[in-house]
Amino acid sequence: MQKDDVAGRITAVAEQVLTPQGLELVEVEYKREGRQMVLRLFVDKPGGISLDDCAAVSRELSEILDVEDFIRENYTLEVSSPGLNRPLKKEADYERYAGRLVKVRTFELLADEEGNRRKTFLGDLVGLSDGVVTLTLREGQLARIPLDKIAKANLEFEF
C-alpha cells in the first residue's frame, strides 16, 4: 500500500477514535525514518492535549490497526500534540487562531499590499474570508493570500 493510501486510511480510522473523545486530528505523517516506517498522528483539543490523552489514543488506535492490519510493513506508532508551531490545515483553523502570529509559505511568489513579491509571509492572522487568508504583516501592511496558494501555514511562537 502506498504511503498516501495509508495516510488516508489512517485518517478515517483515527477520526472514529478521536471524535467521540472530543479530540481533533491535526495531521497524519507516514514516512521512513532511517530503516523504519513511522506513523505519526498529531492530535489536539480545546485547552490542549495531555500526555494521558495521547497514550489513550495510541492504545486504542494500535488495537484497531492490529485488527484491520492494512499496513503490511513494520512501523512505529507515535501520537503527539501538534506543538507550539501547530500547522493550520483546515479552514476553521484560520478563524480559530485569528490574532495569533503565523508563518505562511506559498507555492509561488505573491505580492503583498506594497507590491513586494515573496513566498514567505509572517504576520498576525486576521482571518479567512471567501477563500482568502488575510495577515497583518510585521511591516504593517496587509497580505491577502488565496487558500489554494498556501503550501504550508503554521503558528509561530512569540518570544
From Swiss-Prot:
Can you cite a GO biological process for this protein? translation
Supply the alphabetized keyword list.
Cytoplasm, Ribosome biogenesis
Record-linked InterPro entries: Ribosome_maturation_RimP (IPR003728), RimP_C (IPR028998), RimP_C_sf (IPR036847), RimP_N (IPR028989), RimP_N_sf (IPR035956)
Do you know which CDD domains this protein is assigned to? YlxS_C
Q: Where in the cell is it found?
A: Cytoplasm
GO annotations of cellular component type: cytosol
Q: According to the lineage, what is the superkingdom? A: Bacteria
The record's listing under Pfam families reads: DUF150_C, RimP_N
Statement: the UniProt record of this protein carries the keyword Manganese: no
Q: What is its main location?
A: cytoplasm
Q: NCBIfam families from the xrefs? A: PRK14647.1 (NF011241)
Q: What HAMAP family does this protein map onto?
A: RimP (MF_01077)
Tell me, in a sentence or two, what this protein's role is. Required for maturation of 30S ribosomal subunits.
Family assignment from sequence similarity: Belongs to the RimP family.
Know the name of this protein?
A: Ribosome maturation factor RimP
Q: Which gene encodes it?
A: rimP
